[in-house]
Amino acid sequence: VEKLNVVTPPITAEKRLTVTDKIELPRITMSWLTPPFYEAGDADLDMFGAVLGGGKTSRLYQRLVYRDQIAQSVTASQGSMQLASVFQVEAVARPGVTLEQLEKAIDEELAKMLEKGPTREELERARTSAVAGIIRGLETSQGVADRLNQYNHYLGTPDYLARDMARYEGVTPESVRAAGQRYLKPVSRLVVLGIPGEKVIEDVPRGTPPKEDVQITKTAPDWRATPPGP
């Protein structure tokens, strides 16, 4: 099967959408289109997301949750996929905090990352976590099979582990900053503001399994009454 050659149209102007949903607290989600899985820039943006919002030591968590106490939670990550990836920042406001306050704080931290990139210590911590995650996934035979299948599916070869690790080893603070400046521009994002209210967007429908034509036999078939021959 030939690999699909699909060009995803870029977002050239910021798009904003406000939706109501059955949620308790307002939330904001920012999304950017980024390079596909394993292509140039994917690993850099993976590290960008880890430093910006990949856990309690990340910049956004330290600023929004700990210092300013304006967010219940905040995350940032590179969602790697085959045709195009999505870099996403999501934050849930604390009671009494507006989405405008959240967006302003996120934009400030994002601007700092885009200007100077991560520190070497931040990058090393993110790199170690990413590589450790790959290694942990290889501790079981099922994990090895999944990893080999993933490489074969996306790249056409199962023999990619060493090169996958090398992707992260080759990332530098400068390459992370450059990838962010190229792909995470304000004009290239979709901003969704979620506020409590009636649900206006339905969930993606899930197909129901077909009903099987099962015949229930209440009596044993005739052949069971005949003992097997020698």
Model-found features: residue ranges?
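A common structural junction motif
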Residues: D107-P118
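Non-catalytic beta-strand/loop surface segments
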Residues: V1-E39, A50-E100, E121-A132, G143-R147, ...
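C-terminal soluble interaction/assembly domains
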Residues: L114, G156-A162, A178-G180
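Substrate/cofactor-recognition hotspot
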Residues: P95, L102, L110, P196
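Extracellular/periplasmic ectodomains of large secreted or surface enzymes and adhesion receptors
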Residues: G194-P230
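Zinc-dependent metallopeptidase catalytic helix centered on the HExxH motif
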Residues: D42-A43
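Detector for C-terminal structural segments
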Residues: E139, R147-N149, K185-T208
